[in-house]
Amino acid sequence: MIDRYKHQQLRIGSVSPQQISAWAKKILPNGETVGEVTKPYTFHYKTNKPEKDGLFCERIFGPIKSGICACGNYRVIGNQKEGPKFCEQCGVEFVDSRIRRYQMGYIRLACPVTHVWYLKRLPSYIANLLDKPLKELEGLVYCDFSFARPIAKKPTFLRLRGSFEYEIQSWKYSIPLFFTTQGFDTFRSREISTGAGAIREQLADLDLRILIDYSVVEWKELGEEGLTGNEWEDRKIGRRKDFLVRRMELAKHFIRTNIEPEWMVLCLLPVLPPELRPIIQIDGGKLMSSDINELYRRVIYRNNTLTDLLTTSRSTPGELVMCQEKLVQEAVDTLLDNGIRGQPMRDGHNKVYKSFSDVIEGKEGRFRETLLGKRVDYSGRSVIVVGPSLSLHRCGLPREIAIELFQTFVIRGLIRQHLAPNIGVAKSKIREKGPIVWEILQEVMRGHPVLLNRAPTLHRLGIQAFQPILVEGRAICLHPLVCKGFNADFDGDQMAVHVPLSLEAQAEARLLMFSHMNLLSPAIGDPISVPTQDMLIGLYVLTSGNRRGICANRYNPWNRKSYQNERIDDNNYKSTREPFFCNSYDAIGAYRQKRINLDSPLWLRWQLEQCVIASREAPIEVHYESSGTYHEIYGHYLIVRSLKKKILCIYIRTTVGHISLYREIEEAIQGFFRAYSYDTQSYGI
């Protein structure tokens, strides 16, 4: 369906019998109305043609071959000059055969049938709305017992019987003793109700708004009573309050979606289009049929039997009619959800039939496999590995995947640059993988985003757009900060890559789906591009440093022998176990030359205008120099003062890991301010 904003959407829910009839019924040009499936047959065994009014009837679902009717006559589709649009002999329209993929039929049920999803699945919607135990409703649906239908204030047999006797045999066995068959039918239609028809009557009598009001009043009364002190009673009250909340939410949903409760009981059963439940001929002339066809046949057989009992055979006992209604209910249950009531129905080879629920649910169902996760062209799949040097909005595509995804664009580039006269020559050049091919591929990729998806796609951040670049190897490179949105890690996870082809898809990818535009969680608003897992471990190792404190220094005589190999003679820093550096570049250079370790403590000269937060007011130790200057040593910094106590310089105690992290953060902040100043100048702010 299409909403008012012209967005295609799919909504699953209950529909009215009138809507089912509108889907399936169609009026032929001669005024005849078709759409009802009345026969359980598929194809005639001699002619191999669909049976009339059967499950594959061409009058109902359309022709098997476009423009050819059941008689074999041919008409050009859409040509008004060649005569009528349908065959007057067989009643088949001359239309495209693709109509058999969406044209539905229907079965008119001889008795109402409850939809098993709303009755048996938990929570049971029917039981919640009627506020009755599920076992009681099941007994009513499957004709195990009946209930009295109130008829104003007129005297009825049931009222009279209730006035004289209270304990007597069940209605099912006592009532037929007083009436003949004809009398029983009259009595039954007047005073008692059973089966799904009884459920339908109760649902039709519900006023959802009054139901909500009563539920609110009862919920408030239970809340005002408070705790009773009895644990069992308190639990019972809590369960009742939870039930009332569920009941109100369900009623509000029915009101909001304009769904009537009685629609949960079926009077018309939709029949799927034949192309969605095909019969295929395999080698040897054997036929393979969808299980849905066999389940439909079972429903039609039992429904036709019940129709005959109700219309033609007037001498049929009432018990037999009730039994046949139960069989129809069970057949529809098996069609919708095989095995929901116990043992599933099996074929002659002891194989369980696949019902409608089995066809649509699960990973291999219609939705997840065909509609949501269907295989498409211009897509690939590979393992993801970390790409720490990538930008946040970039991903690395292996050459093997990239050349296949963008092959058509590369072919167009080769032809436009007159490097290939036609498509065949261009493909041969691509197979040769010359340098010009990679140059054109890189040029194409610069202007074309790709979409990365990791299953299962549970929220919108499961699919994000990236700017691709070529990488070596056969794995997709991904920035580690985007892993949380995908719920991915680098232990063998696979991701699919798709190429948006249309201009609308490319614009949507650039404006809405790029990874650097999805930094916050759409659900709770918290940052989602945050370091996780390996990055946190790396940052910890980078900034952990040496656990030795300032007191474990070279003045300890027991440590001098252990750290003699760490003495460094250089003009830039003193000859000590913990060297001094004038700037961060010298410290990182010494680390690259393997003079110090990543976690080795060192003293780095700090700018005087930058504040140093003191952890202790009094210095731990003071060193005096012959020149008159002295060093005040604190826990994490050192101050060099003159004779007049003027601060000459400050050193902080740190590691190469801390310096590297600080420089990365500083560069990121400076880049942000440069980008911000550029934007303000561009917009004249």
Swiss-Prot record:
Q: Give the enzyme's EC designation.
A: 2.7.7.6
Cell compartments where the protein resides: Plastid, Chloroplast
The family database entries (InterPro entries) matched by this protein are listed as: DNA-dir_RpoC_beta_prime (IPR045867), RNA_pol_asu (IPR000722), RNA_pol_N (IPR006592), RNA_pol_Rpb1_1 (IPR007080), RNA_pol_Rpb1_3_sf (IPR042102), RNA_pol_Rpb1_clamp_domain (IPR044893), RNApol_RpoC1 (IPR034678)
Residues that, per the record, bind Zn(2+):
69, 71, 87, 90
Query: What does the Swiss-Prot or TrEMBL cofactor note state?
Result: Binds 1 Mg(2+) ion per subunit. Binds 1 Zn(2+) ion per subunit.
Listed GO biological process terms: DNA-templated transcription
Q: Where does the protein principally reside?
A: plastid
What keywords sit in the KW lines?
Chloroplast, DNA-directed RNA polymerase, Magnesium, Metal-binding, Nucleotidyltransferase, Plastid, Transcription, Transferase, Zinc
| EC top class named in words | transferase
Q: Which family does it belong to?
A: Belongs to the RNA polymerase beta' chain family. RpoC1 subfamily.
Function summary: DNA-dependent RNA polymerase catalyzes the transcription of DNA into RNA using the four ribonucleoside triphosphates as substrates.
Q: What is this protein called?
A: DNA-directed RNA polymerase subunit beta'
Q: Which gene encodes it?
A: rpoC1
